[in-house]
Amino acid sequence: MKNQEESGWQAFLTLCSKMQKEKFLQDLFSLFLSFSERKDVASRYHIIRALLEGELTQREIAEKYGVSIAQITRGSNALKGLDPQFKEFLQKEI
């Protein structure tokens, strides 16, 4: 089952990379992700961006974006394991 999940995820990523119009990408995510899942992704984006900027405390991030400290901790832990070049890319792009 794990190989099936991995190949499905890779196929999804490949499909995303083929979206040349933002509208198509929005439609694709609306097809595959529920409103709640899209909301969770948006929250994770705000958390990661705020952590990369480093200007707010975790409590301030929680208050500003209406997220839990646990969500922020998960985002922080995910950032710790990033390849330094990828982290630098994110800091420039986010």
Curated annotation (Swiss-Prot):
The record's DNA-binding region positions are 58-81
* Any one Gene Ontology BP term: negative regulation of DNA-templated transcription
> Localized where?
Cytoplasm
Molecular function as annotated in GO: DNA-binding transcription factor activity; sequence-specific DNA binding
Q: Which UniProt keywords apply?
A: Cytoplasm, DNA-binding, Repressor, Transcription, Transcription regulation
Q: Which residues form a coiled coil?
A: none
* Gene Ontology CC: cytoplasm
Which Pfam families does the entry mention? Trp_repressor
Please state which protein family the record places this protein in.
Belongs to the TrpR family.
Q: How does it assemble?
A: Homodimer.
Say what the protein does: This protein is an aporepressor. When complexed with L-tryptophan it binds the operator region of the trp operon and prevents the initiation of transcription.
Instruction: Return the HAMAP family for the record.
Output: Trp_repressor
What protein name applies here? Trp operon repressor homolog
